[in-house]
UniProtKB/Swiss-Prot annotation:
A biological process from GO: rRNA base methylation
Source species of the chain: Borrelia turicatae (strain 91E135)
Tagged with keyword S-adenosyl-L-methionine: yes
Name of this chain's protein: Ribosomal RNA small subunit methyltransferase H
Function: Specifically methylates the N4 position of cytidine in position 1402 (C1402) of 16S rRNA.
One cellular-component annotation, GO: cytoplasm
Family, similarity comment: Belongs to the methyltransferase superfamily. RsmH family.
UniProt: S-adenosyl-L-methionine binding residues: 37-39, 56, 87, 102, 109
Location of this chain's protein in the cell: Cytoplasm
PANTHER family from the UniProt entry: 12S RRNA N4-METHYLCYTIDINE METHYLTRANSFERASE (PTHR11265:SF0), S-ADENOSYL-METHYLTRANSFERASE MRAW (PTHR11265)
Gene field: rsmH
Length: 297
């Protein structure tokens, strides 16, 4: 197995949440986005009486996690599926003590997957977390959607203020040839952007919008939220790490809508990475952690 590139985000804060939990034999920790097992590995090392359910739709990443967590064999159950599908079939009689959903993309996908998540790669513009399931790829969308549909997609799923300029450039390029690689798309978007100072790559929001659409990320989050809280045990905790305002708003509004008698929001404001974490892990800079506790059934 290649080196694990992904550094788990807000790990210390998540461990602190577990410290405050009443951990006893049979404690169940569900990692909804197992990735390469960073969070789960730390949890399993620290707590000998915790069992982990690890979920990931990407079978390649799941196999990497199995290798990295091999020392914990017998304490981890693996499920190769979307987290919303897993919880739609989860038996309510088997309650969960702690659910973690880190909604970020694994560094493996950016660095090693070959699926077009990274700006500067000359690889197929795909962006599907599980290509085997079929469905539209980013290549299909960027080369076939009409002007209005592309404008709406990019603006609504990222808030990109220059979506019209970007789409105009995309359509002009399509007259010459298809857009095949992330590098091509990044170049098109960057040239369409006005010459202003940015802290991020000009193509960041366009890539975000495509990835969200391709993997139906917002639908899966909205579907999962009620399933997650329903699956929690008394005093069970749900911790969600988001990476953009669309996800964060969905989680915030859902938490606010829950019964204050039955649930307690543990984060009036989201927990953000400390300056030190941002320095050694730049991928954490936009992370926000929101946490809720179930008081009783």
């Amino acid at each position: 197995m290649g080196n694990i590139f992904h550094i788990p985000v807000l790990l210390e804060e998540i461990i602190n949440l577990l410290e405050a939990s009443n951990i006893s034999d049979g404690f169940v920790f569900v990692d909804c986005t197992l990735g390469e097992g960073g969070h789960s590995s730390a949890v399993l090392k620290k707590y000998q009486n915790i069992n982990v359910i690890g979920i990931d739709r990407d079978d390649v990443v799941l196999n990497r996690a199995k290798e990295s967590l091999i020392e914990f064999k017998g304490r981890v159950s693996y499920f190769n599926t979307w987290f919303d599908d897993f919880f739609s079939e989860y038996p309510l009689s088997s309650k969960i003590n702690f659910i973690l959903a880190d909604l970020g993309i694994s560094m493996f996908h950016y660095k090693m997957s070959g699926r077009g998540f990274s700006f500067f790669e000359d690889e197929r513009l795909d962006m599907r977390l599980y290509p085997g399931a079929g469905g539209l790829s980013a290549y299909d969308i960027i080369n076939t959607f009409d002007k209005k549909r592309l404008e709406n997609l990019i603006y609504e799923l990222s808030g990109e203020r220059y979506s019209r300029r970007i789409v105009k450039s995309i359509l002009e390029y399509r007259k010459i040839k298809k857009i095949e690689t992330p590098r091509e798309l990044q170049d098109i978007v960057s040239k369409a952007y006005p010459r202003i100072k940015l802290k991020i790559n000009p193509a960041t929001k366009t890539f975000q919008a495509l990835r969200i659409y391709v993997n139906d990320e917002l639908f899966r989050l909205k579907r999962s939220l009620p399933l997650w809280v329903e699956s929690l045990s008394n005093n069970g905790v749900l911790a969600i790490v988001t990476f953009h305002s669309l996800e964060d708003k969905i989680v915030k509004e859902f938490f606010k809508g829950l019964s204050k008698d039955q649930y307690c929001i543990l984060t009036k404001k989201p927990i953000m990475p400390r300056c030190e974490e941002k320095r050694f892990n730049s991928a954490s800079r936009s992370a926000k952690l929101r946490v809720i506790k179930k008081l009783y059934e």
